[in-house]
């Protein structure tokens, strides 16, 4: 028998489930370019779509790893047998995904690359992917014992208003180095896309679009138009009546 819960408790439970699932997959699939998760609930089963840049690593050899993840999720969250399915979906544009770029920068710093060089490489890749603007902030013990923050900005970036919710993609990651923990924050401003593939369909509120005027076709030959409208082809037209001729003048004596 299904337990009835209020709408408020249902929203809270769904939020906790997605947050815990995201945390688990972030730790488990960090090296495979994990970029987010989508949960779709149907009447018969729950579908979990894992977004990643390297989907082959997520699936594993002959689908072994995805089956292991399915079993762990099913056991942890108490799903009935066969009621949960995990799928792996490749990120269409890796350069426009903030999570993927934050993970990329994290592994560059772990590999010993200089902070400035790593950040400029990520910045350039994001802008070449077609974004409108981006911002990368790295904070912590970058040089010496004094903690500081370095910000790298390119293009246009909005910081306030409702468009931030659907135009700006943000990701925060932490990397543990020998000198301490560094914080990484990546913000990517997407471009307006009417098709909705690489950006939001809704344009910015201050966007002004100028419609090009249509080319006017000028007549090359003079055209005569009837004033009263088109004549009826069934009714024959009467020839115009001539005014009566004036009588010749009478000579006077």
Curated annotation (Swiss-Prot):
Kindly list the residue ranges recorded as spanning the membrane. Answer: none
Q: Where do the segments described as Disordered lie?
A: 211-253
Signal sequence region: none
What topology does the record note for this protein and the membrane?
Peripheral membrane protein
Mention any one GO cellular component term assigned to this protein in its UniProt record. Answer: spindle
Q: What class of enzyme is it?
A: lyase
- Ranges where the KH type-2 domain occurs: 21-92
Subcellular localization, as worded in the UniProt entry: Cytoplasm; Nucleus; Nucleus, Nucleolus; Mitochondrion inner membrane
**Nucleus in keyword set:** yes
* Superkingdom of source: Eukaryota
| Statement: the UniProt record of this protein carries the keyword Zinc | no
The catalytic activity of this protein is classed by the Enzyme Commission as 4.2.99.18
Reactions catalysed according to its record: 2'-deoxyribonucleotide-(2'-deoxyribose 5'-phosphate)-2'-deoxyribonucleotide-DNA = a 3'-end 2'-deoxyribonucleotide-(2,3-dehydro-2,3-deoxyribose 5'-phosphate)-DNA + a 5'-end 5'-phospho-2'-deoxyribonucleoside-DNA + H(+)
For this UniProt record, give its keywords in alphabetical order, as a comma-separated list: Apoptosis, Cell cycle, Cell division, Cytoplasm, Cytoskeleton, DNA damage, DNA repair, DNA-binding, Lyase, Membrane, Mitochondrion, Mitochondrion inner membrane, Mitosis, Nucleus, Ribonucleoprotein, Ribosomal protein, RNA-binding, Transcription, Transcription regulation, Translation regulation
UniProt function note: Component of the small ribosomal subunit. The ribosome is a large ribonucleoprotein complex responsible for the synthesis of proteins in the cell. Has endonuclease activity and plays a role in repair of damaged DNA. Also involved in other processes including regulation of transcription, translation of its cognate mRNA, spindle formation and chromosome movement during mitosis, and apoptosis.
Family per UniProt?
Answer: Belongs to the universal ribosomal protein uS3 family.
Q: What is this protein called?
A: Small ribosomal subunit protein uS3
**Gene source species:** Ambystoma mexicanum (Axolotl)
* Gene for this chain: RPS3
């Amino acid at each position: 028998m299904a337990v009835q819960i209020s709408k408020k408790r249902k929203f809270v439970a769904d939020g906790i489930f997605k947050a815990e699932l995201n945390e688990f997959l972030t730790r488990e699939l960090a090296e495979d370019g994990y970029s987010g998760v989508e949960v779709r609930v149907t009447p018969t089963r729950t579908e979990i779509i894992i977004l990643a840049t390297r989907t082959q690593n997520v699936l594993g050899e002959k689908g072994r790893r995805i089956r292991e993840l399915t079993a762990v999720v099913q056991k942890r969250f108490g799903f009935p047998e066969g009621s949960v399915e995990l799928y792996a979906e490749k990120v269409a544009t890796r350069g426009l995904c903030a999570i993927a770029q934050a993970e990329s920068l994290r592994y560059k710093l772990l590999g010993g690359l200089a902070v400035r060089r790593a950040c400029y490489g990520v910045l350039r890749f994001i802008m070449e992917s077609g974004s409108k603007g981006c911002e990368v902030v790295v904070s912590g013990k970058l040089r010496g014992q004094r903690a500081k923050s370095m910000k790298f900005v390119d293009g246009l970036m909005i910081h306030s208003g409702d468009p931030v919710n659907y135009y700006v993609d943000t990701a925060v990651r932490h990397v543990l180095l020998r000198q301490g923990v560094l914080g990484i924050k990546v913000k990517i401003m997407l471009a307006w896309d009417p098709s909705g593939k690489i950006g939001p369909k809704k344009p910015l509120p201050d966007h002004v679009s100028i419609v090009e005027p249509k080319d006017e076709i000028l007549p090359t030959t003079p055209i005569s138009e009837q004033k009263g409208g088109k004549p009826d082809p069934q009714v024959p037209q009467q020839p115009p009546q001539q005014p009566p001729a004036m009588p010749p003048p009478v000579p006077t004596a």
